[in-house]
UniProtKB/Swiss-Prot annotation:
Forms part of the ribosomal stalk which helps the ribosome interact with GTP-bound translation factors. The keyword Cytoplasm does not apply. Part of the ribosomal stalk of the 50S ribosomal subunit. Interacts with L10 and the large rRNA to form the base of the stalk. L10 forms an elongated spine to which L12 dimers bind in a sequential fashion forming a multimeric L10(L12)X complex. Keywords: Methylation, Ribonucleoprotein, Ribosomal protein, RNA-binding, rRNA-binding. GO terms for cellular component: cytosolic large ribosomal subunit. Belongs to the universal ribosomal protein uL11 family. The keyword Ribonucleoprotein applies. The gene is rplK. Gene3D superfamilies: Ribosomal protein L11, C-terminal domain, Ribosomal protein L11/L12, N-terminal domain. GO terms for molecular function: large ribosomal subunit rRNA binding; structural constituent of ribosome. This is Large ribosomal subunit protein uL11. HAMAP family: Ribosomal_uL11.
Amino acid sequence: MAKKIDAYIKLQVKSGSANPSPPVGPALGQKGVNIMEFCKAFNARTEKMEKGMPIPVVITVYSDRSFTFETKTPPASYLLKTAAGLKSGSPRPNTQKVGTIARAKIQEIAEMKAADMTGADVEAMTRSIEGTARSMGLVVEG
């Protein structure tokens, strides 16, 4: 018989550096999950990724306080910033542009995120990420 699901917890945790401090500790502590067990498992799963990369994670908590978790791909905004070599997006994206990015690079990001995105095809996902790039103040070339 399958375990009864008690809750889903969605967090964004930096790869390789999950620890019991907020936001991880309070979110898991409220549901009675073993926080250190999650931190060790998450850090082990993300050790090969770039250190400090924000990783969305969905934790499924069961009624017996056990858990499973699924990691997603990093946010498109993070991938765009690293591809363009920026620290942050533009505070005024319509008037103040902060950099440029090639359409080929955006398509590469769309293909990487294809598993987590909802879209008809890679072209539709590419257009979605182009919109994110423009809203960050990036100029799309090509």
